[in-house]
Amino acid sequence: EYRDGNKKIAPVVAPRKGGVTIKREGYTTRRYAPPLVAPKRGLTIDDLNKRGFGEDLYSQITPEQREAQVLGNDLTELSTMIDGREEYMAASAMLNSGYVLKQYADDYGEKYEEFELFFYDGESDDSKYTPSGHWTDVDYDIIGDLRAMIRLLTSKGLPAEDLVFSPDVTDDIIKNKAIKELLDIRNVNIGTIAPIELPDGASRIGVINIDGHDINLISYDEQYEDENGELQYFMGEGNVVLTAPASGRSLYGAVSQLEQSDGRFHTYMANRVPKYTADAEAETLSLIHIPSPRDVEES
């Protein structure tokens, strides 16, 4: 559900006239079908009879004990992969107010269908700002662009605190003449440890004040491996996003699945839903994590 903010002020009323009725603002309800994220890994008796990673050469671990270790490691690895997919979706939502995902039915990287989900109405995204020049020019008015981006947020009653950008943009910002003058180098304490907690891949290179707004300059260089085995930046190249903490949220859909234990369907409300299936004839065990993430980065 969404409700547009406003900048209305209360009316002035003539004496002895009571009050002036102000209509309540309406809201919009949208229904989304979230995408399915389901990495799967098989486990066979051959896997359990082999020495595991990090085990002693003459290990005394039984296949039964090794099964618990392997499944635990698989759960951790698959969950980390899901974290990466969620981060990819969040970054795409920040950059494009939505995302286009590839849905695979068989082998990863082969045939797929596209899944599209966007969080704006109409043909274009009105929250996207296009500069009039190139930030690579040290004399270009980056401050003017940031001022315009700030107003896009504050005009809707939203805060502007963090400028998150691709690693290749870092040099453009640092070398800009106007930015150099605004960077607060007076607060650099030589020999003093003053850590700032930031997610992996995020580096705060400074703080600038624009019209009373303290803007954190954050370079984000975290990467992921795509379907072709190539490393890509979550933020892509040449991208800048002005946002604020807690400006988005993650929503998860319910997962209904047939359980092998009782042969019945069960529905789960959780961000991680494991599914175990066993094939007695083929002696295999499959593990599937099935979350339904929907990352909405609100502008």
Give a label for each model feature.
Residues 6-8, 248-254, 294:
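Short, surface-exposed beta-strand/loop "edge" segments at domain boundaries and coil↔beta transitions
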Residues 35-121, 145-171, 278-287:
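Long, contiguous amphipathic alpha-helices that act as assembly "spine/axial" helices in icosahedral shell
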Residues 156-252:
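Extended oligomerization regions of viral-like shell subunits
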Residues 231-287:
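C-terminal structured domain segments
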Residues 288-293:
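Conserved small/polar residues in nucleotide/adenosyl-binding loops
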